[in-house]
């Protein structure tokens, strides 16, 4: 009787309450820890400032960026990337979505102490701008090519990038969607080399989507007739992009092909920085996605060696790659090889 009374008094469970998000877990978004400190940064509610706060007290510590004080050519900031030394930041605006995780934007370099701001590059189509570990350089992708800059001089690392043919440093649609990432390059530990994945999708078949006025944001140019977006989309069983690995030596300006074995129809689903300047970690996977291998590759010689092999009965989840941690002497790897997700130390 008592249990029945409690159940009757409880809130009614219906479809609306289930789908409204009322039972979703609470979590914090929009904060970024500042490396080497006990602070985190966040964008103000009006988008006009980037502010630092104390983890211990939750109180505001400093205004790192202010649109008006910096005399920035923008009304608000949409995102930012702090430099590892905490002295500068990248801020971006005018972002436009490409696919689920990727976007193009106009980036600016802001010096926090001097309160000066300058454009990262010309145009509004820069992608995945990333600081080198020593905070001296920034790598980014524009028009499917990789560029590096120190804030004064811009160097174009690749020149063969072309829409629907060759992509450098960012994943094609399949990689972004299936492996849940939007940056396919990585600095080495001291910023003297940059490694990346190159996607040759010239032989992949094209798929076309119709575009309508009622999209968000509204596309008024399609009021009378729909538009069309055509891109390389390999259906199940069809050819994927042909992938290869490359590195760029910041001192010599030379590029080098990296020798990391992979099946003819296999994947390079991640490339990551390690604490060792002579090593990048490259992940490989077979087409069935049930066998993953990690290789340590030297960006200066191109040679590699296998360090981990992960095989599972069904398929390897993308969080295994995204949430693995590469340390100085060990690698922490999530795995559900026995049916349950555990952490394994190598």
Question: Could you describe each region identified by the protein language model?
Answer:
Residues 1-4:
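Bacterial N-terminal signal peptides
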Residues 9-11:
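Boundary at the C-terminal end of the N-terminal hydrophobic targeting segment
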Residues 15, 21, 58-60, 94-99, ...:
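Predominantly five- to eight-bladed beta-propeller fold
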Residues 24-43, 70-89, 107, 123-139, ...:
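Conserved beta-propeller blade repeats
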Residues 42-69, 97-100:
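Beta-propeller domains
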Residues 47-53, 99-106, 143-147, 203-210, ...:
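Structural motif
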Residues 55-58, 111-115, 150-153, 160, ...:
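Short loop/turn segments that connect beta-strands within beta-propeller blades
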Residues 60-67, 118-121, 154-167, 256-259, ...:
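Beta-propeller fold detector
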